[in-house]
Amino acid sequence: MEKLDLLYEGKAKRVYKTDDPRYYIIEYKDEATAFDGKKKGIIQGKGTVNNKVSAVFFQLLEENGVPTHFVELLSPTEMLVKRVEIIPLEVIVRNYAAGSISRRLGLEEGIKFDQPIVEFCYKNDELGDPMVNNYHILAMKLANEEEINALTQQALRINQILSQFLLGKNIILVDFKLEFGRTDEGDIVLADEISPDTCRFWDSATMEKLDKDRFRRDMGGVEEAYMEIARRLGCV
């Protein structure tokens, strides 16, 4: 598969066309941002970790009947994916109170919810990815009712699979962000990435943070946390 023109460059990834219009190549970067791009930095080795960790999760989900855009790893920082039309929604699943929901609702960090909470945010950098509900999504024609239900059910299924898998690695899946895309046939598949950039991972024994929060909060040990996740998942 030949890598062609750069199609899109985001905060954490570059997307390239290939000589087969059905596929793209995603390259993961070491650059890191937080707070809507206000904070920037470099996390050495992040691109490699996120690429390999995402591949582990995509393969696990495929094995459990969840369709994804993943095809194969091409290099330490690159993967081949199916071309999809990204739905401009972030689907967030929360098992514990942390981050924005703690600030928004005055919840103490670390409180476990009786059942997972699913939230939607409209993907728009200029607006700061505002939270939206089903009525907003329908009014803006971002997805229809059937698709909203499918996104919700897929997100909860993914949460169930990943949470159980990670507990076996002594990792708590606190919360995470998903993005989905439509195939040419109209099917919805999981896209983007699942990594320490998009998830909150806590050590199940110590509650130590093993994710991007270490960068956001200037906690230090950022590279070590990313590598620890990769190590526990057998990526290094």
Swiss-Prot record:
<comment type="similarity">
    <text>Belongs to the SAICAR synthetase family.</text>
</comment>
<keyword id="KW-0658">Purine biosynthesis</keyword>
<keyword id="KW-0547">Nucleotide-binding</keyword>
<dbReference type="Pfam" id="PF01259">
    <property type="entry name" value="SAICAR_synt"/>
</dbReference>
<comment type="pathway">
    <text>Purine metabolism; IMP biosynthesis via de novo pathway; 5-amino-1-(5-phospho-D-ribosyl)imidazole-4-carboxamide from 5-amino-1-(5-phospho-D-ribosyl)imidazole-4-carboxylate: step 1/2.</text>
</comment>
<dbReference type="GO" id="GO:0004639">
    <property type="term" value="F:phosphoribosylaminoimidazolesuccinocarboxamide synthase activity"/>
</dbReference>
<dbReference type="InterPro" id="IPR033934">
    <property type="entry name" value="SAICAR_synt_PurC"/>
</dbReference>
<dbReference type="GO" id="GO:0005524">
    <property type="term" value="F:ATP binding"/>
</dbReference>
<dbReference type="InterPro" id="IPR018236">
    <property type="entry name" value="SAICAR_synthetase_CS"/>
</dbReference>
<keyword id="KW-0067">ATP-binding</keyword>
<dbReference type="GO" id="GO:0006189">
    <property type="term" value="P:'de novo' IMP biosynthetic process"/>
</dbReference>
<dbReference type="InterPro" id="IPR001636">
    <property type="entry name" value="SAICAR_synth"/>
</dbReference>
<dbReference type="GO" id="GO:0009236">
    <property type="term" value="P:cobalamin biosynthetic process"/>
</dbReference>
<dbReference type="InterPro" id="IPR028923">
    <property type="entry name" value="SAICAR_synt/ADE2_N"/>
</dbReference>
<keyword id="KW-0436">Ligase</keyword>
<dbReference type="InterPro" id="IPR050089">
    <property type="entry name" value="SAICAR_synthetase"/>
</dbReference>
<protein>
    <recommendedName>
        <fullName>Phosphoribosylaminoimidazole-succinocarboxamide synthase</fullName>
        <ecNumber>6.3.2.6</ecNumber>
    </recommendedName>
</protein>
